[in-house]
């Protein structure tokens, strides 16, 4: 993902890994990729993976993703900390299909929701929960772009993969990054 920003026209020194930027609801947030140009934010990218125990982490990862985006937008709206270009954020998820049994995730005994659940979540696997989340992140503008990659190990030990969300593929992410970098280069001559 870092290389996508560089290939789009940013200098290598302008695209850093694992760096913090200011937050509003918290002091700062460390993003996996932070791209800048002339001291202004071009984009931030969060990269997550789920290799085991999805039941322990799926909801937390989705909640964290929403919070990170809301926090970044709030600090920009209220302080302008990131410069004149506004916030551009992407969320990427690699999910190991081998940990997902493809069985529907059931509610714990006596823990049914009090209100009707969105039909799209019925039935739900952890992989489908991530796919729904990232598709909605993009369509609702929570994130500008994303990438979901589902992986598995084939019987011959090679790695297989698919990109289950048409709006969140490597190619759509690259297209979004290229457009954002072009915008930054034009807006900040």
Residue ranges and their predicted role:
Residues 27, 34-44:
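Active-site beta-strand-loop-beta-strand hairpin of nuclease catalytic cores
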Residues 40-51, 90:
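Glycine-rich, often proline-containing surface loops adjacent to acidic residues and nearby aromatics
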Residues 150-189:
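A cross-taxonomic marker for long C-terminal extensions/tails that follow the last structured domain
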Residues 55-155, 166:
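Acidic, metal/cofactor-coordinating or nucleic-acid-engaging core segments within structured domains
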Residues 3, 7, 71-74, 183:
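A generic structural signal for well-ordered alpha-helical segments enriched in polar/charged residues
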Residues 1-18:
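Acidic-basic catalytic patches of nuclease active cores, encompassing PD-(D/E)XK
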Residues 20, 47-52, 94-96:
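An acidic- and aromatic-residue-enriched active-site/binding cleft used to recognize and process polar
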Residues 18-33:
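Charged, often glycine-rich, active-site loop that binds/positions anionic groups
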